[in-house]
């Protein structure tokens, strides 16, 4: 398997930041009440992750090891501020919905973890691809959790899409079924914990099924050699 296929496999499935590493759980559980919020936060996180990996890879040879973590945090904070200002200017409704969890991307362990573990030790191209795959894997988990909670909670999909994509996106809202009142368990944090647990369990079931279908290689027992003492 090539390096890039391995990076894609690691980010999207085997070492997924949300399902395996369980990083960034605070925003993951807090803002995934709707698919729109989940997609918005996922895209913002992915942009910061790609940008931080690129910049860290560029400066890795010029930053002393003793101060690398503060420098990485400053780079991430600058990128988060830029993304925050962009969303504030062009998607103000989404900016209000995400609230404090948008600037808290700075403290997301996924970003600082990839900067330290990968970007600081690899080329710009590989670091960019790693950031893309890790960010995409995290975004997919956010979207699946957000979509399931929104459907169960209020029977819709892409509700409030205009906050992310503009006025034209109002027509994207899909009414799955009509509900008189929202299913609060799905919309509140307890529902997020239950949904996340089910996603992790589903991934484990799939992994176990794939592993069970793999042909088992039987190791041959080492042959015993009889040593006869000769006088």
Swiss-Prot record:
<comment type="function">
    <text>Part of a membrane-bound complex that couples electron transfer with translocation of ions across the membrane.</text>
</comment>
<feature type="transmembrane region" description="Helical">
    <location>
        <begin position="18"/>
        <end position="38"/>
    </location>
</feature>
<comment type="subunit">
    <text>The complex is composed of six subunits: RnfA, RnfB, RnfC, RnfD, RnfE and RnfG.</text>
</comment>
<keyword id="KW-0812">Transmembrane</keyword>
<dbReference type="GO" id="GO:0022900">
    <property type="term" value="P:electron transport chain"/>
</dbReference>
<feature type="transmembrane region" description="Helical">
    <location>
        <begin position="182"/>
        <end position="202"/>
    </location>
</feature>
<feature type="transmembrane region" description="Helical">
    <location>
        <begin position="93"/>
        <end position="113"/>
    </location>
</feature>
<keyword id="KW-0472">Membrane</keyword>
<feature type="transmembrane region" description="Helical">
    <location>
        <begin position="69"/>
        <end position="89"/>
    </location>
</feature>
<feature type="transmembrane region" description="Helical">
    <location>
        <begin position="39"/>
        <end position="59"/>
    </location>
</feature>
<feature type="transmembrane region" description="Helical">
    <location>
        <begin position="127"/>
        <end position="147"/>
    </location>
</feature>
<dbReference type="InterPro" id="IPR010968">
    <property type="entry name" value="RnfE"/>
</dbReference>
<keyword id="KW-1003">Cell membrane</keyword>
<dbReference type="GO" id="GO:0005886">
    <property type="term" value="C:plasma membrane"/>
</dbReference>
<dbReference type="Pfam" id="PF02508">
    <property type="entry name" value="Rnf-Nqr"/>
</dbReference>
<protein>
    <recommendedName>
        <fullName>Ion-translocating oxidoreductase complex subunit E</fullName>
        <ecNumber>7.-.-.-</ecNumber>
    </recommendedName>
</protein>
<keyword id="KW-0249">Electron transport</keyword>
<dbReference type="InterPro" id="IPR003667">
    <property type="entry name" value="NqrDE/RnfAE"/>
</dbReference>
<keyword id="KW-1278">Translocase</keyword>
<keyword id="KW-0997">Cell inner membrane</keyword>
<keyword id="KW-1133">Transmembrane helix</keyword>
<comment type="similarity">
    <text>Belongs to the NqrDE/RnfAE family.</text>
</comment>
<keyword id="KW-0813">Transport</keyword>
């Amino acid at each position: 398997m090539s390096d890039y296929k391995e990076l894609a496999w690691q980010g999207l499935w085997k070492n997924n930041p949300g399902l395996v590493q369980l990083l960034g759980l605070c925003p993951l559980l807090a803002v995934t009440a709707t698919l729109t919020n989940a997609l918005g936060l996922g895209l913002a996180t992915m942009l910061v992750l790609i940008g931080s990996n690129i910049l860290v890879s560029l400066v890795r040879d010029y930053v002393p090891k003793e101060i690398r973590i503060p420098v990485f945090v400053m780079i991430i904070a600058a990128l988060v501020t830029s993304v925050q200002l962009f969303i504030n200017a062009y998607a103000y409704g989404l900016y209000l919905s995400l609230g404090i969890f948008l600037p808290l991307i700075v403290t997301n362990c996924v970003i600082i973890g990839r900067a330290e573990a990968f970007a600081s030790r690899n080329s710009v191209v590989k670091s960019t691809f790693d950031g893309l795959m890790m960010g995409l894997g995290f975004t997919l988990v956010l979207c699946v959790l957000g979509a399931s909670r929104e459907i169960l909670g209020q029977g819709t999909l892409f509700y409030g899409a205009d906050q992310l994509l503009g006025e034209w996106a109002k027509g994207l809202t899909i009414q799955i079924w009509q509900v008189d009142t929202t299913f609060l368990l799905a919309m509140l944090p307890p529902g997020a914990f239950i949904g996340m647990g089910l996603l992790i369990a589903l991934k484990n079931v799939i992994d176990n099924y794939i592993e069970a279908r793999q042909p088992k290689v039987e190791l041959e027992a080492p042959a015993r050699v009889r040593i006869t003492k000769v006088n």
